[in-house]
Swiss-Prot record:
UniProt modified residues of type Phosphothreonine: 376
Protein name: Tyrosine-protein phosphatase non-receptor type 3
The protein's Enzyme Commission number: 3.1.3.48
Membrane topology: Peripheral membrane protein
Domain PDZ: from-to ranges: 510-582
Keywords associated with the record: Cell membrane, Cytoplasm, Cytoskeleton, Hydrolase, Membrane, Phosphoprotein, Protein phosphatase
Domain Tyrosine-protein phosphatase: 646-901
Subcellular location: Cell membrane; Cytoplasm, Cytoskeleton
Organism ancestry: Eukaryota, Metazoa, Chordata, Craniata, Vertebrata
Residues annotated with Phosphoserine modification: 357, 359, 367, 381, 425
Length: 913
């Protein structure tokens, strides 16, 4: 506006009436998005919206579900320094070139094996992106490969070759590579004829699989110069950072060898890990075009490293998952004559063979409609390949490959009759399939890749009169359980059908729950394949349907089936979706098959040692096996990690300390100040603000190091909300804190985890009575260090604060490697000031916050040669703030990190004098 409202001496300046409507709508802007198929679509957003709002609009427009692979690239960027729309930043701060603006929808992350993409839509977008990059010369391609690629692109677009339609020269208007000629198009037309019968999706998959072998596949290039001012290109890919001179790779730095990545002004640094023979750190430096391009390169390196480390799941980890989740007993020495059933849903086999001799009486396949959205099969599945289906061999050591032919809509039931003997013997497998039968024989009885645990017996029970099987759970399965019960049973099989172990440590229970009027079942889950942990019930709301159904759902129950669907290969969010989808069925009933640990009386335990395995030692009076020494405690921890008992102990520890009141957090005026309604501070340890409104969701957490006269003080708090930033900075001011530790990014997986409560340098920001200025920002691959100047606007006093933000934690689960995290914790320790508290927060202020407090406490104990009992540390934290260290995966991660610090000597012992 050219004029403003001003009150001068009671008079108001005149305003042009044409300006008034602009005042109301000036924040709404138009963004033009160029899609990969050439379509341009406009979207309306406000300048105050974050980039995530626009990203969500684009994803919803395309119907994309695997959103993490894509992004929006700025149109005005040079190819020398690509820049992407940031999800957590406001649009007005990113698109400063005026409106309407133009952005390009592109693939951001190219995974090494696109065959693992789950959705056909994602593969199609990969295809379009690769085709465009080759066509425009961004992805260089040898001529012979370009001909083959173009032929698959033609098959995808035109379908099968038809001589009556496709006359010579029918590709004259098509464009595949720069500087193509008629000879090139003639070769493409000739090769097109050979692809007859390929579907569009299959042709595109063939295209992708050839394109991924190209030298620059998935490489994001940034222009730079070496220290002699010679031009080069820095490429970022899934495996690390490469340096190119005249498009020839001269150096490559794998992520595993990179200690950290940093920049200062327009200099970019790669810090490599020291080799055994080296005495000092090796640093590689480059000159970028300017500060902005240097920061773009650093940011892209961090995002690529974080993305591909989170995606990486080692084969041995997958084996651990299958071992952890496979149903059955660990005891293979006892003889079992009972029949028992295992169910295969969606093509995944549960215990298809026994470690010992096991004969399979019959297998029957029954097609059932899927009540949940099916998962698109991988390209590797033989049923998607073109003319490469191999004959199925009769050997049962190929049983895993046979199972890939099962479609997602088939429910397969295996009925085994086990006869376990001490010695191994051959077993025969007969498979009844329609329309033909095949005989399978097993020569390798171990079948370790098919089964990890052996089932022993089943104690099922019959259906009660009038009861019915849940949706997706076949009645024949329940009947089979009924028939094999020893001596029959009067229990209701629709309620209790069990896969009991010989030692009775767990069994399966079928639970039916009908939602309440609001459509809620009343329980929370944690875990999932993305979190590398089984799905476990973490909380039951009192008087909810889950609490009042018979049999009732219990905390700690492991979810096995949801309405007959195997969920062992699904992520946490997918499982939540399946549960919500059950409300849309005719019965609205949720049928859960859960694994529950059996409760044994004390008389059932043969020894005190066996009793101690059930109840954690740290919960009873401490009596460590290795004595009260650091070495003994580490031996005990290592043994517990190998056996899995540390996780059992952790799950049995109370989440909230009994008897501690939580009242102030639940007052009406304070409810909207809590990010999560169930993560609240105790009254006795909450942080009180100065003034009338004294509430903030924050707790004092003091960790005493015994025999060292040392107390590490923390303030654990949630990530600030937009309307609680003033209270957050008031805590910093009241406590005169000099260090803030942030353990999350602003958004993760499209969800806001924390409001940005600090300004970008050199901007300033006002919160309440405080003026915050970010004076500097130093970035590495794992964390960002900022220096803040906080000024009290009433008194003019100033206070300097260091802000550390850890950015290497993956969006879900825990890091695969603890190196970056341990380096970060050491840096935090180096900045700690005497007895001053350190303010630590993540999103809720309990999970990653608890991991950091546990790790620093363990390091302090290690350097003083004192024993470390992680469960004791967690209990002490939970006595001061509920639910510290939120998940089993976090607890396992920090336990493994503690053991690594001890075994590798990453913390030096202090001189006892």
């Amino acid at each position: 506006m050219t004029s403003r409202l001003r009150a001068l001496g009671g008079r108001i300046n005149n305003i042009r009436t044409s300006e008034l409507p602009k005042e109301k709508t000036r924040s709404e802007v138009i963004c033009s998005i160029h899609f990969l198929d050439g379509v341009v679509q406009t979207f309306k957003v406000t300048k105050q919206d974050t980039g995530q709002v626009l990203l969500d609009m684009v994803h919803n427009h395309l119907g994309v579900t695997e959103k993490e692979y894509f992004g929006l690239q700025h149109d005005d960027d040079s190819v020398d320094s690509p820049r992407w729309l940031e999800a957590s930043k406001a649009i007005r701060k990113q698109l400063k070139g005026g409106f309407p603006c133009t952005l390009h929808f592109r693939v951001r992350f190219f995974i090494p094996d696109p065959n693992t993409l789950q959705q056909e839509q994602t593969r199609h977008l990969y295809f379009l992106q690769l085709k465009m990059d080759i066509c425009e010369g961004r992805l260089t391609c040898p001529l012979n490969s370009a001909v083959v690629l173009a032929s698959y692109a033609v098959q995808s677009h035109f379908g099968d070759y038809n001589s009556s339609i496709h006359h010579p020269g029918y590709l004259s208007d098509s464009h595949f590579i720069p500087d193509q000629n008629e000879d090139f198009l003639t070769k493409v037309e000739s090769l097109h004829e050979q692809h007859s019968g390929l579907k569009q999706s299959e042709a595109e998959s063939c295209y992708i699989n050839i394109a991924r072998t190209l030298d620059f596949y998935g490489v994001e290039l940034h222009s730079g110069r070496d220290l002699h001012n010679l031009d080069l290109m820095i490429g970022i890919a899934s495996a690390g950072v490469a340096v190119y001179r005249k498009y020839i790779c001269t150096s490559f730095y794998p992520w595993v060898n990179i200690l950290k990545i940093s920049f200062k002004r327009k200099k970019f640094f790669i810090h490599q890990r020291q080799k055994q023979a080296e005495s000092r750190e090796h640093i590689v430096a480059f000159n970028m075009l300017n500060y902005r391009s240097c920061k773009n390169l650093w940011k892209s390196c961090v995002e690529h490293h974080t993305f591909f480390q989170a995606k990486k799941l080692l084969p041995q980890e997958k084996n651990v998952l299958s071992q952890y989740w496979t149903m059955g007993s660990r005891n293979t020495k006892k003889s079992v004559n009972n029949q028992y059933c295992k169910k295969v849903i969606g093509g995944m086999v549960w215990n298809p063979a026994m470690r010992r001799s096991l004969s399979v009486e019959h297998l029957e396949t029954k097609s059932l409609p899927s009540r949940s959205p099916p998962i698109t099969p991988n390209w590797r599945s033989p049923r998607l390949r073109h003319e490469i289906r191999k004959p199925r061999h009769s050997s049962a050591d190929n049983l895993a490959n046979e199972m890939t032919y099962i479609t997602e809509t088939e429910d397969v039931f295996y009925t085994y009759k086990g006869s376990l003997a001490p010695q191994d013997s051959d077993s025969e497998v007969s498979q009844n399939r329609s329309p033909h039968q095949e005989s399978l024989s097993e020569n390798n009885p171990a079948q370790s890749y098919l089964t990890q645990k052996s089932s022993s017996s089943v104690s099922p029970s019959s259906n009660a009169p009038g009861s019915c099987s849940p949706d997706g759970v076949d009645q024949q399965l329940l009947d089979d359980f009924h028939r094999v019960t020893k001596g029959g049973s009067t229990e209701d099989a629709s309620q209790y059908y069990c896969d009991k172990n010989d030692n009775g440590d767990s069994y399966l229970v079928l639970i039916r729950i009908t939602p309440d009027e609001d459509g809620k079942f009343g329980f929370n889950l944690k875990g999932g394949v993305d979190q590398k942990m089984p799905l476990v019930v973490s909380r039951i709301n009192p008087e909810s349907p889950a609490d009042t159904c018979i049999p009732k759902l219990n905390e700690g129950d492991q979810i096995v089936l949801i309405n007959g669907r195997d969920i062992s290969e699904h992520t946490h969010d997918q499982v939540v979706m399946f549960i919500k989808a059950s409300r849309e069925s005719h019965s609205r009933e949720l049928a859960l098959v859960i694994r529950r640990r059996a409760v044994r009386s004390f008389a059932d335990f043969k020894s005190e040692d066996e009793l101690n395995q059930l109840f954690p030692e740290a919960i009873f009076p401490m009596c460590p096996e290795g004595g009260d020494t650091l070495e003994g405690s580490m031996a005990q921890l290592k043994k517990g990690l190998e056996s899995g008992t540390v996780l059992i102990q952790f799950e049995q520890l109370y989440r909230k300390k009994p008897g501690l009141a939580i009242t102030f957090a639940k007052l009406p005026q304070n409810l909207d100040k809590n990010r999560y309604k169930d993560v609240l501070p105790y009254d006795t340890t909450r942080v009180l603000l100065q003034g009338n409104e004294d509430y903030i969701n924050a707790s004092y957490v003091n960790m005493e190091i015994p025999a060292a006269n040392l107390v590490n003080k923390y303030i654990a708090t949630q990530g600030p909300l937009p309307h609680t930033c003033a209270q957050f900075w008031q805590v910093v001011w009241d406590q005169k804190l000099s260090l803030i530790v942030m353990l999350t990014t602003l958004t993760e997986r499209g969800r806001t985890k924390c409001h940005q409560y600090w300004p970008d340098p050199p901007d300033v920001m006002n919160h309440g009575g405080f003026h915050i200025q970010c004076q500097s920002e130093d970035c590495t691959i794992a964390y960002v260090s900022r220096e803040m100047l906080v000024t009290n606007t009433q008194t003019g006093e100033e206070h300097t604060v260091t802000h550390l933000q850890y950015v290497a934690w993956p969006d879900h689960g825990v890091p695969d490697d603890s190196s970056d995290f341990l380096e970060f914790v050491n840096y935090v320790r180096s900045l700690r000031v005497d007895s001053e508290p350190v303010l630590v927060h993540c999103s809720a202020g309990i999970g990653r916050t608890g991991v950091l407090v546990t790790m620093e406490t363990a390091m302090c104990l290690t350097e003083r040669n004192l024993p470390i009992y992680p469960l004791d540390i967690v209990r002490k934290m939970r006595d001061q703030r509920a639910m510290m260290v939120q998940t089993s995966s976090q607890y396992k991660f920090v336990c493994e990190a503690i053991l690594r610090v001890y075994e590798e000597g990453l913390v030096q012992m202090l001189d006892p004098s």
